């Protein structure tokens, strides 16, 4: 028997039944328990969501920016009031430790809504003088109906990140969460309605990739914001372009390099490498999974990492002491185990972990040990391909130019980091690394003020920061002539 009642769609400010007749189950990855049966949206349901969003968006856009800002700030207050309740739900659905969801997932989502609520009144046009009798002014107008497609690793945070700038700019959003972690987006929809967002302005349609494809191809949707894998992102982008040339934001995968130089504080470097590989059980798109270490400090760095791996507390996500939970699904577990086996076969030296955990209460969950390979080479699969799990690959380098060249030798370009005691080197190296999100002597923080997104095949566009708001508006240019009109004929 499921823990929660059947999960329906959220359209027009209320729960509604899907018309497809199909459902799918969402499972607790720590126990294998069925959390809920979820209704799959049909094409008719997507159409209903679009029409509802069009109606709601007109009402929402007609409000003043200050009025929209107040509503969004109220949503932030409710999110923070319900932080613990939402964190518990997110932990059950994702398998993340409760200590993590309490501190990060809802809080960082609320921060982004608060940030854009503050910017809603700052959406301004320009006035451009042409001559004494004529000028141009520009207006930034909302796009209309936007769609967001979320990933399974940060369900409510991603829903907040995508909806906040859209709503602040006067748009409506139809959001499709991942079918692996579909629960918390519905709670966000409830909160938006309670805060005063008009019906239809934030709709949630559940389902698999078929639903995402319907959203990407719908001619009345003006923008798609997608978070997920590169290959799926390419398909979404293709559908978006072929249907109506809609604008896209793509936050895709990565195989990010972390460069540790021989002048680094190695204790700090080891701490950074641990966070960059094992936070959220390695299921973070920006993870620094290619750890390049300068030869002279390799042995010491390996010892420090091994010491820290032994301190990881793998356990039930609901236990406050746990800091490493299961992977999000059985499919992801099998994928990660396959990469671990590949690493062994290709000659990497297994320094820690490498096995599925099956004893006791671990047996029903999707647990894999935190895994560290060393002696890795650039052509190994575990070094080339995104694993999206707790697998660190340590590589050795000799000089700065070599490290930069090898770090950039990838189709990805999401994130990169440098650990060094030389500030000049830090900036010099960062400026040559081909990545959209970079850190110096730290890793992983993505505050609301910071634009995040990738180079190369890691994405298109940015989320968060000032510039993102511009991409949820379009510019209308208006010329005004105050003097006589000069006839042409």
From Swiss-Prot:
GO MF term set = betaine-aldehyde dehydrogenase (NAD+) activity; metal ion binding
Where Cysteine sulfenic acid (-SOH) occurs, the residues are 285
Q: Which GO terms describe its biological process?
A: glycine betaine biosynthetic process from choline
Question: In which domain of life is the source organism classified?
Answer: Bacteria
- The positions annotated as site (Seems to be a necessary countercharge to the potassium cations) read 247
Residues where K(+) 2 binds: 245, 456, 459
Q: Where is the active site?
A: 162, 251, 285, 463
Regions that span the bilayer:
none
> Which Enzyme Commission number(s) are on file for it?
1.2.1.8
Keyword rRNA-binding in record: no
- Cofactor remark from the record: Binds 2 potassium ions per subunit.
What family is reported?
Belongs to the aldehyde dehydrogenase family.
Function (record text):
Involved in the biosynthesis of the osmoprotectant glycine betaine. Catalyzes the irreversible oxidation of betaine aldehyde to the corresponding acid.
What PANTHER family does UniProt report for this protein, alphabetically?
Answer: ALDEHYDE DEHYDROGENASE-RELATED
**Mind telling me what this protein is named?**
Betaine aldehyde dehydrogenase
Q: What is the lineage of its organism?
A: Bacteria, Pseudomonadati, Pseudomonadota, Betaproteobacteria, Burkholderiales
Q: Which gene encodes it?
A: betB
């Amino acid at each position: 028997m499921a823990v929660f009642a059947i999960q329906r769609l959220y359209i027009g400010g209320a729960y509604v039944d899907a018309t497809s007749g199909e459902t799918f189950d969402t499972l607790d990855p720590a126990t294998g328990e069925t959390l809920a049966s979820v209704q799959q949206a049909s094409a008719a349901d997507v159409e209903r969501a679009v029409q509802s969003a069009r109606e709601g968006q007109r009402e929402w856009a007609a409000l003043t920016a200050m009025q929209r800002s107040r509503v969004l700030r109220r949503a932030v207050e409710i999110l923070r009031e319900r932080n613990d309740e939402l964190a518990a739900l997110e932990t059950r659905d994702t398998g993340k430790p409760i200590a993590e969801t309490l501190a990060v997932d809802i809080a960082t989502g609320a921060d982004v809504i608060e940030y854009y609520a503050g910017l809603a009144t700052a959406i301004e046009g320009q006035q451009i003088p042409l001559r004494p009798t004529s000028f141009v002014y520009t207006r930034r107008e909302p796009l209309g109906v936007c769609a967001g497609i979320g990933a399974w690793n940060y369900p409510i945070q991603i829903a907040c990140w995508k909806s906040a700038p859209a709503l602040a700019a006067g748009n409506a959003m139809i959001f499709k969460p991942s079918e692996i972690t579909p629960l918390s987006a519905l709670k966000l929809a409830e909160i938006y309605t309670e805060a005063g967002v008009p019906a239809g302005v934030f709709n949630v349609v559940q389902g698999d990739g078929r639903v995402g494809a319907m959203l990407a191809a719908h001619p009345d949707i003006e923008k798609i914001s997608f978070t997920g894998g590169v290959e799926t992102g390419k398909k979404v982008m293709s559908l978006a372009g072929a249907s109506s040339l809609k604008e896209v934001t793509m936050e895709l995968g990565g195989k990010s390099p972390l460069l540790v130089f021989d002048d680094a504080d190695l204790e700090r470097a080891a701490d950074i490498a641990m966070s960059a590989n094992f936070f959220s059980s390695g299921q973070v798109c920006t993870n620094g999974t290619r750890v390049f270490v300068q030869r002279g400090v390799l042995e010491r760095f390996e010892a420090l990492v091994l010491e820290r791996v032994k301190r990881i507390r793998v356990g039930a996500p609901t236990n406050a002491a746990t800091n490493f939970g299961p992977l999000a699904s059985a499919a992801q577990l099998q994928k990660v185990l396959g990469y671990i086996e590949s690493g062994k076969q290709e000659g990497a030296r297994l320094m820690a972990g490498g096995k599925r955990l099956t004893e006791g209460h671990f047996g029903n969950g999707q647990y894999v040990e935190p895994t560290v390979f060393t002696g890795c080479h650039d052509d190994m699969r575990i070094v080339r391909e995104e694993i999206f799990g707790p697998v660190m690959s340590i590589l050795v380098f000799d000089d700065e130019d070599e490290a930069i060249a090898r770090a950039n030798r990838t189709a990805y370009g999401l994130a990169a980091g440098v650990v060094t005691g030389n500030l000049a080197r830090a900036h010099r190296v960062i400026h040559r690394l081909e990545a959209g999100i970079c850190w110096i002597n730290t890793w992983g923080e993505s505050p609301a003020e910071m634009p995040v997104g990738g180079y190369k095949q890691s994405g298109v566009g940015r989320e968060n920061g000032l510039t993102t708001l511009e991409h949820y508006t379009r510019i209308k240019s208006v010329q005004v002539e105050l003097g006589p009109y000069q006839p042409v004929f």
